[in-house]
């Protein structure tokens, strides 16, 4: 099963840098040639997508619509939960279960207002694809600590070779508290079994007061995630501050430093920290 994200326009951009005395040089062309083709249009903010066959796609629209796409035609699917659309939040990633061809199960993340506090947080769901609708919808995880802030929800989903599910939640705009506190949701990569239960070998499973689903922490807004096809490692793209984007290979229990260390600055141009590297924090 093929998996692509971020765009409905399928394209490949090839580039290469050659180290020279005066710095890297970008080559204008590399063979073979690639072309791009518009598969479907009329989707305002496509957030995630996944192939369900060689000719069919599921595509999320951030405003809260899940589309089935085939032969250039998009069909809106029914059965989604209520989506809390605010700022960067809405309907986020979608992917298929490893056994999708037999189970017809999909997983997706979305902003949810469930809970007592006002506002929302990122939630993970699964459901069975049944024609043009979703059946047996289940909420597998919901971040606690709702907030009306509209930024940094994450979110992407991937699986390891053993079938564990990984998904991301951003710091929800509370960088001074959430990312470095393993008793709080936000700024984390999570690891679950596909039924929503928590693996007992998770790094903080036996730590009192911790969120047992946490796999790594110290993240700002992980908006890209893939499993390396050869090594099986989980690679995450971190949407950082200005000048502070990162690509990280995720390790169990590791602290990726946000906001204690960063190469970035605030979008306003003011500094966040002068620290770039500290003991116990991943680069």
Predicted regions and their residues:
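Acidic, Gly/Ser/Thr-rich repeat motifs that build Ca2+-stabilized beta-propeller blades
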Residues: 21-175, 224-227, 232-240
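Sec-dependent signal peptide recognition
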Residues: 2-9
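C-terminal motif of bacterial Sec signal peptides marking the signal peptidase cleavage site
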Residues: 15-17
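Beta-propeller domain segments
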Residues: 23-26, 89-91, 101, 172-283
């Amino acid at each position: 099963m093929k998996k692509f994200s971020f765009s409905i326009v399928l394209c490949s951009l090839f580039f290469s840098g050659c180290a020279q005395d005066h710095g890297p040089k970008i080559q204008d062309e590399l063979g073979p040639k690639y072309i791009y083709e518009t598969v479907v249009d009329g989707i305002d903010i496509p957030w995630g997508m996944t192939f369900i066959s060689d000719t069919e796609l599921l595509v999320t629209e951030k405003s809260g619509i899940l589309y089935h796409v085939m032969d250039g035609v998009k069909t809106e699917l029914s059965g989604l939960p209520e989506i809390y659309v605010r700022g960067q939040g809405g309907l986020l990633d979608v992917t298929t279960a490893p056994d999708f061809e037999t189970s017809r199960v999909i997983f997706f993340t979305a902003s949810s207002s469930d809970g007592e506090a006002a506002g929302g947080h990122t939630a993970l769901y699964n459901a069975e694809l049944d024609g043009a609708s979703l059946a047996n919808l289940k909420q597998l995880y919901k971040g606690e600590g709702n907030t009306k802030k509209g930024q940094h929800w994450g979110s992407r989903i991937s699986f390891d070779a053993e079938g564990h599910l990984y998904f991301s939640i951003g710091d929800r705009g509370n960088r001074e508290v959430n990312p470095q506190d393993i008793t709080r949701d936000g700024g984390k990569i999570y690891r679950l079994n596909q039924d929503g239960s928590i693996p007992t070998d998770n790094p903080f499973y036996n730590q009192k007061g911790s969120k047992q689903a946490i796999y790594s922490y110290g993240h700002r807004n992980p908006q890209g995630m893939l499993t390396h096809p050869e090594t099986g490692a989980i690679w995450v793209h971190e949407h950082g501050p200005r000048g502070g984007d990162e690509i990280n290979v995720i390790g169990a229990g590791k602290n990726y430093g946000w906001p204690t260390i960063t190469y970035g600055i605030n979008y306003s141009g003011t500094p966040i920290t002068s620290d770039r590297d500290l003991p116990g924090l991943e680069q």
